[in-house]
Amino acid sequence: MEKLTILLLVAAVLMSTQALVERAGENHSKENINFLLKRKRAADRGMWGECKDGLTTCLAPSECCSEDCEGSCTMW
């Protein structure tokens, strides 16, 4: 009976350890996905933030990173 109790305790510890490891893996995957999404969003915003890069159509100079709009943003 004593051996059975020890065996059950060991099994419970192993199962709880496995559950903790699996949860940590899920969080790590979510962190990777969030990191990649943030990088994609930054690339969509343009090199300098919330402005348009060179050769992108614009209506006002404030839309361009270079603050120079002549129908399209100039590079510098």
Swiss-Prot record:
Which UniProt keyword terms apply here? Answer: Bromination, Disulfide bond, Gamma-carboxyglutamic acid, Hydroxylation, Knottin, Secreted, Signal, Toxin
Checking InterPro entries in the record gives: Conotoxin (IPR004214)
Residues bearing PTM 4-carboxyglutamate: 50, 63, 67, 70
In the record, 4-hydroxyproline modifications are located at 61
Task: Give the record's GO CC terms.
Answer: extracellular region
Q: Does the keyword Disulfide bond apply?
A: yes
Instruction: Provide the propeptide boundaries.
Output: 20-45
Cystine pairings recorded for this chain: 51-65, 58-69, 64-73
UniProt entry tagged with the keyword Disulfide bond: yes
Residues in the signal sequence: 1-19
Q: In which tissues is it expressed?
A: Expressed by the venom duct.
Pfam families per UniProt:
Conotoxin (PF02950)
Q: Where in the cell is it found?
A: Secreted
Which GO MF term does the entry hold, naming one?
A: toxin activity
Which residues are reported to carry the modification 6'-bromotryptophan? 48, 76
Q: What is known of its domains?
A: The presence of a 'disulfide through disulfide knot' structurally defines this protein as a knottin.
**Similarity-based family:** Belongs to the conotoxin O2 superfamily.
Its recorded name reads Conotoxin Gla(1)-TxVI
Which organism is this protein's natural source? Conus textile (Cloth-of-gold cone)
